[in-house]
Regions:
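Aromatic-lined carbohydrate-recognition surfaces of secreted/lumenal glycan-active proteins
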Residues: 20-22, 162-164, 168, 185-211, ...
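Loop/turn elements at helix/coil->beta-strand transitions in domains of secreted/extracellular proteins
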Residues: 14-17, 40-43, 76-81, 154-160, ...
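Alpha-helical scaffolding within the catalytic cores
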Residues: 3-4, 26-34, 65-69, 144-148, ...
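Substrate-binding surface in catalytic domains of secreted glycosidases
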Residues: 224-253
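Substrate-binding cleft of secreted/luminal carbohydrate-active enzymes
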Residues: 17-22, 249-326
Length: 326
C-alpha cells in the first residue's frame, strides 16, 4: 500500500490539493467538525507521536494509546495516515520548545555510526566513554517511536511521517545547529529504515533553509508551515523550495492556521501536494464547533467542495492503485 500511496501522491501532484487536518491527540474532533459543516471529510488525518516516548508515556498513556488506535482505524478505513513528531526531550526538563527544555543535542552527537547498534553494543560504547548517555537516550526514544510506527507496518498501512519540524527556526531543542540537526535526522532515518525495517514510511522534511536540509536521499517530501492568517498559496516559497533539490520533491503545506485557497494555488502555479490545518482553536472551539478564527464557514465550505480539493471519499484503494497502469 505504501507504493500505492506514493504513486497516488505523484500522480495527483500539480493537479489537485489533498485535504488534511491535524487533530487533537486521541480524537477526530476537528475532522468531525469539518464533515458536519461541509459534508466532506479530510483525506488525511495528521496526528503526533509526542506522547509516545518514554519521558512522556507513563503520564500520558491514555492520550498516546487513544491516538494510535484512532490513527489505525483511520488507515483501516482507507484514509491517509500522517504523524508529526514534536519530540519531548528524553531527559532533563522535558519539553520540545528550546526555551523550556534543558536537553542539549550537541551532547549526544557522535562521529560513530550507531544506527544499527543493539542495546548491548550501546551499553558497551557508553561504558567505554565512546558515546554519551544522551546519545543512548535519543536512540531509546527513536526506538519507542519506531515501535508505534511498526503497528501500522504490521497492518500494511503507510504513514506520512514528518518528525522534528522547523529545525531551522531555533524554536525547538533539535534546532539551532544545522550540523547537529542533520546528524539527528539521518540517525533517525537510518535507525527506522534499516534497523527497524519501517518500509511503510513516507518521509517529510519540514523547513525553509537549505543549510538544514538532510539530503535528497533522506526525505520524500519537503513541507512548509504557514502561520500568517492568509489564503495565499505562497507561490514564492513554493518556487524557492522547488529549487532546493536537483531531484524534484513533492511540496506540501504541513501545518497552517488559515487554509490556503486551491483556486489561488492554480492561479499562481503553486499546487501543493496537501495542506493540513492546525489542531485546536485553529479549527474548532472548546465545544468542538467550527471556530472561524482563521477560516470562515464560507471559505471552509468553498475549499472542501472545490473540484481542486481531494477529500476522503475520492481516495483510491492504495493496494490496487499501486498496480494501475498509466
Amino acid at each position: 500500500m505504501t507504493l500505492g500511496l506514493k504513486k497516488f501522491l505523484a500522480d495527483n501532484y500539480g493537479k489537485r490539493v489533498i485535504a488534511g487536518q491535524t487533530v487533537t491527540p486521541g480524537s477526530n474532533a476537528e475532522i468531525d467538525a469539518i464533515t458536519r459543516e461541509t459534508g466532506r471529510t479530510p483525506a488525511m488525518r495528521t496526528g503526533d507521536l509526542m506522547f509516545c516516548t518514554p519521558s512522556k508515556y507513563e503520564g500520558t498513556k491514555e492520550y498516546a494509546d487513544n491516538e494510535v488506535a484512532a490513527a489505525l482505524e483511520w488507515g483501516r478505513n482507507g484514509g491517509i495516515v500522517s504523524f508529526g513528531w514534536h519530540w519531548y526531550a528524553p531527559e532533563g526538563k522535558s519539553d520540545y520548545y528550546a526555551d523550556t527544555s534543558t536537553f542539549v543535542l550537541g551532547d549526544a552527537v557522535t562521529d560513530r555510526d550507531i544506527s544499527m547498534a543493539d542495546d548491548e553494543e550501546l551499553k558497551t560504547l557508553q561504558e567505554s566513554g565512546l558515546i554519551s548517555e544522551q546519545t543512548v537516550l535519543l536512540l531509546k526514544d527513536i526506538d519507542a517511536a519506531a515501535e508505534v510506527l511498526d503497528k501500522f507496518r504490521g497492518e500494511n498501512i503507510p504513514v506520512i511521517f514528518q518528525p522534528i519540524p522547523d529545525g531551522d527556526s531555533s524554536m525547538y531543542w533539535w534546532g539551532g545547529s544545522a550540523e547537529n540537526y542533520k546528524w539527528l535526522w539521518k540517525l533517525m532515518f537510518q535507525r527506522m529504515d534499516k534497523y527497524h525495517g519501517l518500509n511503510n514510511l513516507i518521509w517529510v522534511w519540514n523547513g525553509s533553509s537549505g543549510d538544514y536540509f538532510p539530503g535528497e536521499d533522506y526525505c520524500d517530501v519537503i513541507g512548509q508551515s504557514f502561520y500568517e492568517n492568509s489564503p495565499s498559496p505562497f507561490a514564492g516559497r513554493f518556487s524557492a523550495l522547488a529549487g532546493m533539490t536537483d531531484v524534484p520533491k513533492l511540496l506540501a503545506v504541513t501545518n497552517c492556521d488559515r487554509l490556503p485557497s486551491p483556486d489561488y494555488m492554480r492561479r499562481d502555479s503553486a499546487m501543493w501536494s496537501w495542506f493540513s490545518a492546525g489542531s485546536g482553536n485553529c479549527m474548532i472551539t472548546n465545544n468542538g464547533e467550527l471556530s472561524e478564527k482563521y477560516t470562515s464557514w464560507q471559505n471552509l465550505h468553498d475549499i472542501y467542495n472545490s473540484e481542486l480539493c481531494v477529500t476522503l471519499d475520492e481516495l483510491p484503494d492504495f493496494e490496487e492503485y499501486a498496480f494501475q497502469e498509466e
